[in-house]
Amino acid sequence: MPHDNIPFPVTFAAGAVAGISEVLTLYPLDVVKTRMQLSVGKSDYNGTFDCLKKIVKNEGPHRLYRGILPPILMEAPKRALKFASNDTYSKLWRKVFKRKDSSPALSILTGSCAGFTETFVVVPFELMKIRLQDVKNASKYNGTVDCFTKIVKQERILALYNGFEATMWRHVVWNAGYFGVIQKIRNSLTPASSRIGEIRNNLIAGTIGGIFGTFLSTPFDVIKSRIQTVPRIAGQVPKYNWAYPALVTVAREEGFTALYKGFVPKVLRLGPGGGILLVVFNSVIEFYKRCLVHNASA
C-alpha cells in the first residue's frame, strides 16, 4: 500500500485524520474491552452487551467516554506514524531487497517495523487510558491531567512507560497481521471501477485486516492491560511484568481462553475500525492528489 510520490507530511496527516475518525466512532467498545480484560477469574460481565448495559445503568452513559482524551491525543500521532512509517519502511525494504512492488512477506515486515515505531508514542497515553477506564481506579483520578500528574508524582516519570514491552508486541503483531492481510485481500477482490467500488474494497480489506490483526494481538493486549493498571511499588516484584511469562501465568491460572478476554468488543472495534482507517487514509491521499491536479491545471 505504499504511496511512492506522496510526501511524508501528507501520509502523516492522512493517518492522523484516519485515527481520530476511528476513535470518535468506536471508543465505547474500547472501554468495554478494557473492563472485561481487567476482570480476574470469573468475569463481572456476561458478554459485551451485558458489560455495555451495566456501565450505562450503574455509572451513566458518560462513562463510555471516560478516558477518551488520551486516545484522542494519542490517535493523531499513533495512526499518523502507523501509516507514514509503514510507507517509509515499505520504500526502504523494497530498495534493500531490490523489488518494485511489495509482497505479503514484505508487508508483514514493514507492518512490524511500523508497529514498533508507534509504540514509543502510544505507551504513556495507553497507560493513562487504562487507569481511567478501570473501575477500581475510577475514584483515584479526576480526569486525564490529574491522572498524569499523580502518576508522575507518585510513581515517577518513567512509570508512564510501564508495559512498554507488552505494548510493543501488541503493536508489532497487530500491524504485521493488518498490513500483511490488506494487500492479499485487495488483490483477490474485483478491481474497483468507481470511487464507491474503491471505498468498498478498502473497507472490506481493512476490516478483514483489522479482524486478523486483533486475533493475533489480543493475548498481548490482555497482558498489557494487566501490567499497566497496577502501580509499581518500590521493592515489590509485580505479578505481571514481562509479556511472555505473563502469558504463561494467565493461561495457567485462568485458562487459555482468559488470554482472549475482551476479544468480542475489541474485534467489533478494530475490525470495522481497520476498515475506517484504510478508507479515511486513502480518501485523504486521494484528496491531496486531486488538489495537486487542480493546482497544476489552474
UniProtKB/Swiss-Prot annotation:
Q: Which UniProt keywords apply?
A: Membrane, Mitochondrion, Mitochondrion inner membrane, Repeat, Transmembrane, Transmembrane helix, Transport
The record's InterPro entries line, in alphabetical order, gives: Mit_carrier, Mito_2-oxodicarb_carrier, Mitochondrial_sb/sol_carrier, Mt_carrier_dom_sf
- List the molecular function annotations (GO) for this entry: alpha-ketoglutarate transmembrane transporter activity; L-aspartate transmembrane transporter activity; L-glutamate transmembrane transporter activity
A cellular-component GO term for this protein: mitochondrial inner membrane
- GO biological process annotations for this chain's record? aspartate transmembrane transport; L-glutamate transmembrane transport; malate-aspartate shuttle; mitochondrial 2-oxoadipate transmembrane transport; mitochondrial alpha-ketoglutarate transmembrane transport
Q: Which Pfam families match?
A: Mito_carr (PF00153)
Name the SUPFAM superfamilies for this protein.
Mitochondrial carrier
Note the topology in the membrane: Multi-pass membrane protein
Q: Where in the cell is it found?
A: Mitochondrion inner membrane
Q: List where the protein spans the membrane.
A: 6-26, 62-81, 105-125, 159-179, 203-223, 267-287
User: Per its UniProt entry, which superkingdom is the organism in?
Assistant: Eukaryota
Where are the Solcar-type repeats located? 6-92, 102-188, 197-287
Family listed: Belongs to the mitochondrial carrier (TC 2.A.29) family.
Q: What the protein does?
A: Transports C5-C7 oxodicarboxylates across the inner membranes of mitochondria.
Q: What is this protein called?
A: Probable mitochondrial 2-oxodicarboxylate carrier
